A protein has these predicted regions:
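Amphipathic alpha-helical scaffolding segments comprising HEAT/armadillo-like alpha-solenoid repeats
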Residues: 1-4, 15-29, 36-37, 48-60, ...
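Conserved hydrophobic register position within alpha-solenoid helical repeats
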Residues: 6, 36-39, 70, 102, ...
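Structural signature of alpha-helical solenoid repeat scaffolds
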Residues: 11, 27, 44, 75, ...
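Short acidic/histidine-centered micro-motifs embedded in hydrophobic/aromatic stretches
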Residues: 25, 42, 57-58, 73, ...
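Residues within HEAT/ARM-like alpha-solenoid scaffolds
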Residues: 34, 65, 97-101, 120, ...
Length: 170
């Protein structure tokens, strides 16, 4: 299939027109699932922000491999509209690694949005930290703490570090 090389060529081009072509291809939803996955991956690689709405519509795919591509792409191009969708996907995944990569995608999105949407990220990371603790997922809890430390004002970081050091699960 030539869909993979063609989609990667458009992604490598990096122009606005190339991004528009990828989004248009995804909107048409033509071709095989492999073709769609190739286009979704290219959108992620080219960081085509305009694709968020189309990707959100594709989220929830029955095919776990398609879902993985969509969630990965949302982690690369999504904005605050993607936060609740990826939060729910991470929750459904039990805040751990599994085939769709939902938890990893959510963490990656939070890390990417720290600078542009600090308040929403802080709120989401605090919620993630509590939920991960409840689920017994220490690695996700640690990732949420790293996000909080990156987002927090420097004056408050030392307090957070001291509190983390006193945590019984250290």
């Amino acid at each position: 299939s030539l869909s993979g090389p063609a989609a990667r060529a458009l992604a490598a081009n990096g122009s606005e027109k190339a991004g528009q072509a990828l989004v248009a291809a995804l909107k048409r939803r033509s071709g095989s699932p492999k073709t769609q996955k190739d286009v979704i991956r290219a959108i992620a690689d080219a960081q085509v922000k305009e694709a968020e709405t189309v990707l959100l519509a594709l989220q929830g795919a029955a095919d776990p491999n398609m879902q993985k591509e969509v969630l990965y792409a949302l982690s690369c191009v999504g904005g605050s509209n993607s936060l609740p969708v990826l939060a729910k996907a991470a929750e459904n995944a039990g805040y751990t690694m599994e085939i769709t990569g939902a938890n990893e995608a959510y963490i990656a999105l939070l890390k990417r949005l720290v600078q542009s949407d600090r308040d929403a990220v802080m709120k989401a990371a605090k919620k993630l930290q509590k939920a991960a603790a409840k689920a017994g997922q220490e690695q996700t809890r640690e990732a949420a703490l790293q996000i909080l430390l990156a987002a927090e004002e420097p004056a408050k970081v030392s307090k957070m570090v001291i509190a983390a050091m006193k945590d019984p699960s250290k």
